[in-house]
Amino acid sequence: MAKVPVYNIEGQQIGEIELNDSIFNVPINTHVLHQAVVAHLANRRQGTFAAKTRAEVRGGGRKPWRQKGTGRARQGSIRAPTWRKGGVVFAKKPRDFSIDLPKKVKRLALKCALSSKVKENNLIVLDRWDMNQYKTKEVLRVLKNLGLENQKALIVIPEKNEYLQKSTKNIPEVKTLQVGNLNVFDILKYDKFVILQDAVKKVEEVYA
């Protein structure tokens, strides 16, 4: 089992933690990671857009002028795509973009993403982070102590902490997630992966 340092919010190392190799030390499968990211982005799409074809736009049944003799270009309908307020060629219709990956693939992708953070030395374990007020300045102070100033960081907590979650919303480069909402896209998107010690245990309980 790999050992990584455990820090407090002052940035001081206070111990070490052993990480489960079956989660944090698996071979990186880039194909599986790609599948997971594509599925995540596809599942975020609403697919509620809709436009009308020339057959669906109201009006345009009468020929605007006779075929020959006017000197103008021939036209059959004022709802042709070339006309203002005309129909759309190959109009988009509501559709479901969601991609359902097998559970084994999802789990493997998450393990690969976590393992990549360990191998790149981008995983930081915190012993605890208790907040009892909304204070973005405090979050910035802790991140500075950890050497993460002006860096993209994902903070993973074991359970809901409204003070911490809302305090990080004002920082564009930082996002806070509960273990239950952990996903491959966010793990890969953010350069640094900050996880609380209790959250590590929870991840190992769920995915080991």
Curated annotation (Swiss-Prot):
The keyword Ribonucleoprotein applies. One of its GO terms (cellular component) is ribonucleoprotein complex. InterPro entries: Ribosomal_uL4 (IPR002136), Ribosomal_uL4-like (IPR013005), Ribosomal_uL4_dom_sf (IPR023574). Gene3D superfamilies: 3.40.1370.10. Residues 58-77 are annotated as: Disordered. The keyword RNA-binding applies. Disulfide bonds: none annotated. HAMAP family: Ribosomal_uL4_B. Belongs to the universal ribosomal protein uL4 family. Part of the 50S ribosomal subunit. One of the primary rRNA binding proteins, this protein initially binds near the 5'-end of the 23S rRNA. It is important during the early stages of 50S assembly. It makes multiple contacts with different domains of the 23S rRNA in the assembled 50S subunit and ribosome. PANTHER family: 50S RIBOSOMAL PROTEIN L4 (PTHR10746), LARGE RIBOSOMAL SUBUNIT PROTEIN UL4M (PTHR10746:SF6). This is Large ribosomal subunit protein uL4. The gene is rplD.
